[in-house]
Amino acid sequence: MTTIDTISDVITRIRNANILKLDRVELINTKVAIGICHILKDRGFINSFGEFLNSSDRMSNRRFIQKYIIVNLKYKGERRSPCIKELRRISKPGRRVYVGYKNLHKTKGGIELFVLSTSKGLITDYTAREKGIGGELLFSIC
């Protein structure tokens, strides 16, 4: 199966797994998905993630191998409330949103985190302000 928008796919899978309070979620392995997982792990939104190969028999004797990422989600307390409260896509394929580093302001008391795609790779809004670079505003995490 091919996905057009891998960022939305990653966000939707994580959001749905959080709603169902699953321990882990399976993502298709792309460079963008790995970058998102690194940011989520560094900021403490997930426990861990790892890559693995999954092979399946299709179309007679051909063997297709697909790489996946397993993300171990993080919850708080006995009631297992998710660490990720809100995951919202901002820049979409039909409507791109670009920002300069001067236009990145702290919001919601510093709780909300923005992820940008820049020439230096995927970075958070804090890092973008620190380095003085702007880029495409992909999504926000709360």
Swiss-Prot record:
Keywords: Plastid, Ribonucleoprotein, Ribosomal protein, RNA-binding, rRNA-binding. The keyword Ribosomal protein applies. GO terms for molecular function: rRNA binding; structural constituent of ribosome. It is found in: Plastid. One of the primary rRNA binding proteins, it binds directly to 16S rRNA central domain where it helps coordinate assembly of the platform of the 30S subunit. NCBIfam families: PRK00136.1. HAMAP family: Ribosomal_uS8_B. PANTHER family: 40S RIBOSOMAL PROTEIN S15A (PTHR11758). Part of the 30S ribosomal subunit. Belongs to the universal ribosomal protein uS8 family. This is Small ribosomal subunit protein uS8c. The lineage of its organism: Eukaryota, Discoba, Euglenozoa, Euglenida, Spirocuta.
